[in-house]
UniProtKB/Swiss-Prot annotation:
InterPro entries: Chitinase_II/V-like_cat (IPR011583), Chitinase_insertion_sf (IPR029070), DIAC_cat (IPR047898), GH18_Domain-Containing (IPR051887), Glyco_hydro18_cat (IPR001223), Glyco_hydro_18_chit_AS (IPR001579), Glycoside_hydrolase_SF (IPR017853). Keywords: Glycoprotein, Glycosidase, Hydrolase, Lysosome, Signal. GO terms for cellular component: lysosome. Belongs to the glycosyl hydrolase 18 family. Its main location: other. Its EC number is 3.2.1.-. It is an enzyme of class 3 (hydrolase). The active site is at 127 (proton donor). GO terms for biological process: chitin catabolic process; oligosaccharide catabolic process. Glycans are attached at residues 131, 177, 212, 246, 283. Residues 23-366 form the GH18 domain. This is Di-N-acetylchitobiase.
Length: 366
């Protein structure tokens, strides 16, 4: 339909009408359906994977919620009432984004979805292999740049972020233009976990996010010319449970060789365990919680009903506080976690204390 015959006033109203036509505001107040415009000095970036545990989160800290579960309008309304953004998940096959027309269509769909759901941006979570000399290398950077331009043009105050591995050194065969992507979006969420996804040395259980190894990743990003203010540290609220082929007297747990993207061993030999499960298991374990000084991380050993020894590595308030201190001391943009649903939000007194301590660990110690 041609627009040339419409009065100028009507043309000015079109963006508003388009937003309203996406559906009436589900919040108690229409103002809560407006995008968040405030840019906090410090980000606390929370991944939520669904259900209603968000009602018990520490909203005094949260600045952004990446909604990776089913869309929940109640969450959006509540987050906005607390001044926090709620952003979409963005995932797409890299083979498709080589085509500029396909990119434009995908971006337009995401913008429309964000508008319809009164959301504040998008978190692009790709995590796919990219060869440095492939067309996907440049196309990925273009995708981020074009996504940022579209969202910021269409939704005032919107935020576009991109998830990267714990190190820029081609982890899991991901060769990305990190400096170009950082320049093209608001900030990078650095996934400082799953750091045993490629084990090149001994095939043994180790920390999900060893302290020194984690910090080396940030040093390498900054050496590339990426500003610390473009980096948000992601910490794990889960651990890995490994079956030990052999458990030595020194607590060395030899694990099954499971190759991953070229590496002979990986954390795929274990399985992920949320913090709430770990807390219920650790005190009844064979060893109780132990602290590894080299990796600055806790672990414990237990025996399953079949008589096999397991070793569980995880992060707790002690290990997370160390990393949060680095965030503060080196001026990073903020901190966040995968994922907020991993804690126990029940009415149990001990669980409540443990959950409060994990949220509290995100606050950098001065």
């Amino acid at each position: 339909m041609a627009l040339c015959g419409l009065p100028e006033f009507t043309l000015l109203l079109l963006p508003l009408l388009a937003r309203l036509s996406a559906g009436d505001c589900p919040c108690s107040e229409a103002a809560l359906c407006q995008p968040i415009r405030h840019r906090p000095d410090f980000e606390v970036f929370v991944f939520d994977v669904g259900q209603k545990t968000w009602k018990s989160y520490d909203w005094s800290q949260i600045t952004t919620v990446a909604a990776f579960g089913k869309y929940d309008p109640e969450l959006m309304c509540y987050a906005h009432s607390k001044g926090a953004r709620v952003v979409l998940k963005g995932d797409i096959s890299l083979k498709n984004i080589i085509d500029p027309t396909f990119r434009a269509s995908w971006i337009a769909q995401k913008v429309d979805l964000a508008k319809a759901q009164y959301m504040d941006g998008i978190n692009i979570d790709i995590e796919q292999e990219v060869n440095c000399s492939s067309p996907e290398y440049e196309a990925l950077t273009a995708l981020v740049k074009e996504t940022t331009e579209s969202f910021q043009r269409e939704i005032e105050g919107s935020q576009v972020t991109f998830d990267v591995a714990w190190s820029p050194k081609r982890i899991d065969k991901r060769c990305y233009n990190y400096t170009g992507i950082a320049d093209a979006c608001d900030f990078l969420f650095v996934m400082s976990y799953d750091e045993q996804s490629q084990i090149w040395s001994e095939c043994i259980a180790a920390a999900n996010a060893p302290y020194n190894q984690t910090l080396t990743g940030y040093i390498d990003y900054i050496k590339m010319g990426i500003s610390p203010k473009k980096l948000v540290m992601g910490v794990p609220w889960y651990g890995y449970d490994y079956i030990c082929l052999n458990l030595s007297k020194d607590d060395i747990c030899t694990i099954t060789k499971v190759p991953f993207r070229g590496a002979p061993c990986s954390d795929a030999a274990g399985h992920q365990v949320p913090y709430k499960v770990i807390m219920k298991q650790v005190n009844g374990s064979v060893s109780g919680s132990q602290w590894n000084k080299d990796q600055q991380a806790p672990y414990y050993n237990y025996k399953d009903p079949a008589g096999r020894f397991h070793q569980v590595w995880y992060d707790n308030p002690q290990s997370i506080s160390l990393k949060a201190a680095y965030v503060k001391n080196y001026g990073l943009r903020g901190i966040g976690m995968w994922n907020a649903n991993c804690l126990d939000y029940s009415d149990d007194a001990l669980a409540r204390e443990q959950t409060q301590e994990m949220w509290g660990a995100l606050k950098p110690r001065l």
